[in-house]
Each structure stands twice: as C-alpha cells, then as structure tokens.
Amino acid sequence: RRGFFLSFFPSDTPHYENVLPDGWCLTDIGELLINRDGERKPVSSVIRSKQTSKIYDYYGAAGVIDKVDSYLFDERLLLIGEDGANLLSRNKNNAFFAEGRYWVNNHAHVLDATDKNLLDFIAIVINSMKLDDYITGSAQPKLSQDNLNKIPIVLPPLAEQQRIIAEIKKWFTLIDQIEQGKADLQTTIELTKSKILDLAIHGKLIPQDPNDEPAIELLKRINP
C-alpha cells in the first residue's frame, strides 16, 4: 500500500515547485492545519484503573489503548503519533482518525482544519511518508510539534483531493479483497489439511483392504 501512496506523492521535496500540476501548491502542516495539542490530557494508568464507567476511547500514539469515564473531544479529528517506535517502523498508520466522543493523551498530536475535508487528504500524505527526517531520538523516537509543523504538503485543489481519495479507496478495496482472498485460501488449505489428517487417523481416507494384517498383530510384533 505504501508504494501506491508514494506513486501519488514523490519524495524529492526540493523540486516540488518545479513539478507541481496546475492549481497545486506547496505548503506545510503548520500553515495548513490547526493544532489542538493544548486540549489533550494524559490520565495515568492508576487513575484509569479506578474508573468504573469506561465508555469512551482513550487514544495514545498509535490508536485506542484504553477506555475512560469522560471525554475531551466530540468531533472527528486527525491524530498523529507523537512518540514511540511506530513512528519509524510504521507497523500501524501514524495518522489516524478519532470520531465520536473520546479522550487523547499527550502521545498523539491532535489536528483540526477550517475545512475538515482537508484532514482525509493529509492523513493519506502522512501515511505515505517516511518521517525519519522529522523525528528526534533513537531509543524513544519523537515527532515534536515544531517538526510536525515543518512537514511539507503538496496540496491539490479540494475537488482534486476528493478525486484522489476516491481513487485510492477504490484501489484499496480491491487490494483488501485480494488479501482477504489469500487469507480465505490459506484458511481453506489449513482446514483441508486438518480434514485429511482426521480422515486418515480414522481409517476413512482410503478404502480398507480386509486382507491387511490387523494393527493388533503389528503391535504384538513391536511389543511382544
């Protein structure tokens, strides 16, 4: 999937201005989005363990990590991991959405936009990128707010953003179907193997020959 992302967004940042299609522009996260990190609050595991209702998602750097009794946000916003190994490994998307009522701790940046349609496109761009140049620390990788704001965004017109998103979703649906087909095939293979073994050990895999020596006779020879 990342290769598909990268086909839309080349990584040669210094030359963006020379290759931009008509109507596109070069900007960055800081200029384009509204940072709402000041509204997030961490809740310690000790406090969370004492809560009883626990009906709202509690987000960390890579997604939901717990449930809590209350919420900070009640709208769809874009979250981007602030720290943790996933920033470099990208085993999960570094940009993801939170919806409904939820709480965000201080390990995920909270981003909003004057036109929330922008957020879907930005999520695609961020998840297509290697963020190494904007991350500090090796033992504990961190994407600071300052560095997050510097990430360049090649921005098409809003209508074209929507067409790009629709095209990506179409291809991802096809990819998911292929992956599911492979998973279903693997499941079928495993079930078939199990069934063959089950038939074999119950004497039903092949026709039995009444002239075969009984197994009890074999056992007597092995263990007189």
What are these regions (language model features)?
Residues D209-P210:
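Charged, heptad-repeat coiled-coil alpha-helices that serve as long linker/dimerization "arms"
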Residues F8-P42, S49-G60, K150, L158-I165, ...:
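Non-catalytic DNA-recognition/assembly elements of restriction-modification systems
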Residues G60-N127, T136-A139, L143-L148:
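A short beta-sheet element
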Residues R1-L6, P42-R48, V64-D69, N94-E99:
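Intrinsically disordered, low-complexity boundary segments flanking structured domains
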Residues N18-G23, V46-Q51, V68-L72, G100-Y102, ...:
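A general structural signal for short secondary-structure junctions and capping/turn motifs
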Residues R1-L6, I122-L131, I135, A139, ...:
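S-adenosyl-L-methionine
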